[in-house]
UniProtKB/Swiss-Prot annotation:
Molecular function via GO: magnesium ion binding; RNA binding; RNA-DNA hybrid ribonuclease activity
Cited InterPro entries: RNase_HII/HIII, RNase_HII/HIII_dom, RNase_HIII, RNase_HIII_N, RNaseH-like_sf, RNaseH_sf, TBP_dom_sf
GO biological process, one term: DNA replication, removal of RNA primer
Protein's UniProt name: Ribonuclease HIII
Cofactor remark from the record: Manganese or magnesium. Binds 1 divalent metal ion per monomer in the absence of substrate. May bind a second metal ion after substrate binding.
Transmembrane intervals: none
UniProt cofactor(s): Mn(2+); Mg(2+)
Localization per Swiss-Prot or TrEMBL: Cytoplasm
Top-level enzyme category: hydrolase
SUPFAM superfamilies for the chain: Ribonuclease H-like (SSF53098)
Family: Belongs to the RNase HII family. RnhC subfamily.
Catalytic activity: Endonucleolytic cleavage to 5'-phosphomonoester
Residue span, RNase H type-2 domain: 91-308
């Protein structure tokens, strides 16, 4: 399970120690000044002023402190997995997220978006939040309102290009890294000379792996980059990026459905196999490849359905 680590100042570390005293664990790991366990989360504070949250409720617990901590006088490491500076939620940040990676039909879609502190109240009023529970109509309604307000860049990897790259040996993580890096670079160019205080990527790979994927890129964004899972809940920029990415993904999906003349389903379950088999029967395997990620198991399952 992923860990969330935040960097705090000394007074806050002492405050956390007192707050978690009723849940304290007497067994301290090396370098720790306190340890506690609550339902769904273990918390460990270290002499280095780093505090680690582990467990299913770890990120939610950490977020309480990230959102309320005073600004730390010490500068946090600019590129560190899982370490977010104090008061991160109110900083001016470029956030990036992607959709479509687990869908048999449709492109991978990545969006990077910049949100500053002044824009946050309006975005919240317009409904920007963690979008996982939102239905497509709500996503589209909010996206159309915020896109003129938020500097952003959306990049799609269409299915034919995806299949070409995959056959050349590129995995999905590499594709996502390239798209995130370029989308972030695009937003930085739009903002110049303004610079964000940080860049937050919704984490899909370890930091070292992410940068290894980008090794051959002529321009690699490294300064003030942070990685976190469930980053939509850590900064509005990622929530906005997720909403815009999903909006563009839905648009692409609708266009493909109209083009092929069949409503295309999302996901990669059995319901997807049946539609894929119908496309093979009516138009052939080459047509299916135009709209799908060919290496998914759905391709073989659909072929077996056709042969029965």
């Amino acid at each position: 399970m992923a860990n969330t680590v935040i960097l705090v100042d000394q007074p806050t570390l002492e405050k956390m120690k007192q707050t978690y005293l009723p849940f304290s664990n007497p067994k301290l790991p090396p370098g720790a000044v306190f340890a506690a366990k609550k339902p769904g989360v273990s918390i460990t504070g270290y002499k280095s002023r780093k505090v680690m949250f582990q467990g299913v409720n770890g990120e939610a617990e950490a977020k309480k402190w990230v959102a309320t901590l005073p600004e730390s006088k010490a500068k946090a490491p600019s590129v560190s997995k899982g370490i977010l500076p104090a008061n991160f939620a109110s900083k001016n940040v470029i956030g990036s997220d992607e959709v479509g990676t687990g869908d048999f039909f449709g492109p991978i879609t990545v969006c990077a978006a910049y949100v500053d502190a002044e824009m946050m109240p309006l975005l919240k009023e317009l409904g920007v939040k963690d979008s996982k529970a939102m239905k497509d109509p709500e996503i589209c309604r909010i996206a159309e309102k915020i896109m003129p307000l938020v500097p952003h860049s959306v990049l799609l990897c269409p299915n034919p290009k995806y299949n070409e790259l995959q056959k050349r040996g590129m995995n999905q993580g590499q594709m996502k890294a390239l798209l995130h890096n370029r989308a972030i670079e695009n937003v930085l160019k739009k903002l110049a000379p303004i610079k964000p205080e940080a860049i937050l990527i919704d984490q899909f790979a370890e930091k070292n792996t992410y940068y290894r994927y980008l090794a051959k890129e002529p321009s690699i964004i490294r300064e003030d980059v942070f990685f976190a899972t469930k980053a939509e809940g850590l900064h509005l920029s990622v929530a906005a990026a997720s909403i815009i990415a999903r909006y563009k993904f839905v648009q692409a999906f609708d266009a493909m459905s109209k083009e092929v003349g069949i409503p295309l389903p999302k996901g990669a379950g059995p319901h997807v196999d049946a539609v894929a088999a119908e496309i093979i029967e009516r138009f052939g395997l080459e047509t299916l490849a135009k709209y799908t990620k060919q290496h998914f198991a759905n391709t073989e399952k659909a072929l077996k359905m056709v042969k029965k």
